[in-house]
Amino acid sequence: MKLKSGIVTGVALVLAYGLFLASYAPARLLTAVPLPAGMVVAEAAGTLWQGSLQRFSWRTLTLDDVHWNITFSDFMPALDIAFKNPEGIAGRGIIRGWQRAQFYQWQLSVPAGYLFSHMRFIVPIGAEGNVQLNLQEATVDRSGCQSLDANVTWPGARVKTPLGGLVLATPQATLRCQQGALEANLRQTSSHLQLSGKGSVTPKGEYRFTGQLSSGNDLPATMKKLLATTGKANEQGARTLNFQGRLL
């Protein structure tokens, strides 16, 4: 019995000592250890427990001014992280959990122009405003999204096209998960355009969107003519949209 008690005490002391070392180990160790191909970290400061990086880059992702703090949230180990991006992206939130990663209380702001620059359009299209994600909770595992409580807004949304500017006011989307797939309920109302619908994306990249689109009184005449060729109008003038396919 005494031997078992001594072993438990010894293990506890080793763990405590390990945590002590981790708490005070300098963050610059991150720049000395082997990293995955293409991953770069620069100007590490603080400790492994609470520190910062001047820059983190991997593949096409680049983050500046990254700060982290290892803590506990609801009795789970948690990583509280904040970052910025040279293109104007800013985010902050918590990643926590034991066996499955849970994203908790995340806020992310991305310039709409940055998002549009990574999309494929037949003609040049620009955008104004920032797309904002407010995520209360999300759980993800190998089979896909298991739970999600989030919403996306785009305050002051405007789209620039060769046919003129399109005022979108503040589009809103509610995000949820269903059987591993991401689901979004979208609603947009402005003097130019009204859009409502529901879309989904599966872990395999299969997407589907069904909704209704109608023009507002202030929509430019050239855009109204283009809209008239989209879908079939109902008695109220709204046109039904149905898209499905697979992401590249």
Swiss-Prot record:
Record-linked InterPro entries: T2SS_GspN_CS, T2SS_protein-GspN
Domain of life: Bacteria
Cellular component GO terms, alphabetical: plasma membrane; type II protein secretion system complex
Recorded coiled-coil stretches: none
Keywords assigned by UniProt, alphabetized: Cell inner membrane, Cell membrane, Membrane, Protein transport, Signal-anchor, Transmembrane, Transmembrane helix, Transport
Position of the signal peptide: none
Sequence intervals crossing the membrane: 7-27
Main location (coarse class): membrane
Membrane topology note: Single-pass type II membrane protein
GO biological process terms held by the UniProt record: protein secretion by the type II secretion system
Side of membrane Periplasmic, spans: 28-248
Keyword Oxidoreductase on entry: no
Cytoplasmic compartment segments: 1-6
Keyword set includes S-adenosyl-L-methionine: no
Cellular compartment(s): Cell inner membrane
Pfam families: T2SSN
Protein family: Belongs to the GSP N family.
Function text: Involved in a type II secretion system (T2SS, formerly general secretion pathway, GSP) for the export of proteins. Required for the translocation of the multiple pectic enzymes.
Protein's name according to its UniProt entry: Type II secretion system protein N
